[in-house]
Amino acid sequence: MGPLALPAWLQPRYRKNAYLFIYYLIQFCGHSWIFTNMTVRFFSFGKDSMVDTFYAIGLVMRLCQSVSLLELLHIYVGIESNHLLPRFLQLTERIIILFVVITSQEEVQEKYVVCVLFVFWNLLDMVRYTYSMLSVIGISYAVLTWLSQTLWMPIYPLCVLAEAFAIYQSLPYFESFGTYSTKLPFDLSIYFPYVLKIYLMMLFIGMYFTYSHLYSERRDILGIFPIKKKKM
C-alpha cells in the first residue's frame, strides 16, 4: 500500500496559509483598534486628544510594530512573497521613529506630528492587511486591490515628511538631554543629533527606492503595461 495522503488541514501549504491569515488578522485588528480609538477620541475631545495620542494608544502601536518585524522572517524563509530590502526599509523607518525618536523623548510624544503619523501608518496598514488577509484565502475584490496598490502613493510621501518633521522636532531635546550620546575612549564621542541628521538625509534616499519598488509592484499587480505596437 502506498503512503496515505495527509488531510488538507495538515498539509504544509494549508498550515502556511492558516498562519499568515491569523497573523494578518491580528495585525488588522490591532491597527483597526488604534484608528477607531483615535477617531472616537478626536470627536469626543477635539484637538486635546491629539496631545495625548501616544499615552492612549502608544503601547498597542509599539506592540503592532514590533510584531511586524516577523514579516522580514516571513520573506526570508519564503512563506511570504515579497522583496526583503524594500520591506526592511519600511519597517526600520517606523521602528526608528517610534522607538528611538518618539518613545525616548517624552516632550516629543505630545507633539501633533505623532497623531498625524499614527493616522497615516494605520490607514495604510488597515488596507494592506485586509488585502493580504483575503488574498491568502483566495478572495479578491477589484476595488480593494486597486485601493491597496494606490492609497500609498499620496500617503507614503506624507509619512516620510511627517517622520522627518518628528526628527526635526526631537533634535533640541536630544541636544539638551544627551540621550544616546556616548563618550568613547581616545577623545572620541558619538553625538546622537548628528546621527539623526545623517539619518534624515538617508530617509529621503530610502523613500525614493521604496517608492520606485512599490510603483513597480503596483504596475505588475494591476496589469498596467505599456502598449506595444504589433508588427505588420
From Swiss-Prot:
Q: Where in the cell is it found?
A: Endoplasmic reticulum membrane
Q: Which GO terms describe its cellular component?
A: endoplasmic reticulum; endoplasmic reticulum membrane
Catalytic reaction annotation: a very-long-chain (3R)-3-hydroxyacyl-CoA = a very-long-chain (2E)-enoyl-CoA + H2O; (3R)-hydroxyhexadecanoyl-CoA = (2E)-hexadecenoyl-CoA + H2O
- Give ranges for the Cytoplasmic compartment: 1-19, 78-112, 157, 211-232
Entry superkingdom: Eukaryota
Q: What class of enzyme is it?
A: lyase
Write the record's keywords in alphabetical order, separated by commas.
Endoplasmic reticulum, Fatty acid biosynthesis, Fatty acid metabolism, Lipid biosynthesis, Lipid metabolism, Lyase, Membrane, Transmembrane, Transmembrane helix
Hey, which stretches end up on the Lumenal side?
Answer: 41-56, 134-135, 179-189
Indicate the residues that form the catalytic site.
Answer: Y156, E163
Keyword Lyase on entry:
yes
Which GO terms of type biological process are on file?
fatty acid elongation; sphingolipid biosynthetic process; very long-chain fatty acid biosynthetic process
**Pathway the protein acts in:** Lipid metabolism; fatty acid biosynthesis
Q: Which residues cross the membrane?
A: 20-40, 57-77, 113-133, 136-156, 158-178, 190-210
A GO MF term: enzyme binding
Where is this protein chiefly located? endoplasmic reticulum
InterPro entries membership: Tyr_Pase-like_PTPLA
Q: In which tissues is it expressed?
A: Highly expressed in leukocytes, and low expression in heart, spleen, kidney, and placenta.
What are its E.C. numbers? 4.2.1.134
What topology does the record note for this protein and the membrane?
Multi-pass membrane protein
What does this gene product do?
Catalyzes the third of the four reactions of the long-chain fatty acids elongation cycle. This endoplasmic reticulum-bound enzymatic process, allows the addition of two carbons to the chain of long- and very long-chain fatty acids/VLCFAs per cycle. This enzyme catalyzes the dehydration of the 3-hydroxyacyl-CoA intermediate into trans-2,3-enoyl-CoA, within each cycle of fatty acid elongation. Thereby, it participates in the production of VLCFAs of different chain lengths that are involved in multiple biological processes as precursors of membrane lipids and lipid mediators.
Quaternary arrangement and interactors, per the entry?
May interact with enzymes of the ELO family (including ELOVL1); with those enzymes that mediate condensation, the first of the four steps of the reaction cycle responsible for fatty acids elongation, may be part of a larger fatty acids elongase complex.
Q: Which PANTHER family match?
A: VERY-LONG-CHAIN (3R)-3-HYDROXYACYL-COA DEHYDRATASE, VERY-LONG-CHAIN (3R)-3-HYDROXYACYL-COA DEHYDRATASE 4
The family classification in the record reads: Belongs to the very long-chain fatty acids dehydratase HACD family.
| Name this protein carries in UniProt | Very-long-chain (3R)-3-hydroxyacyl-CoA dehydratase 4
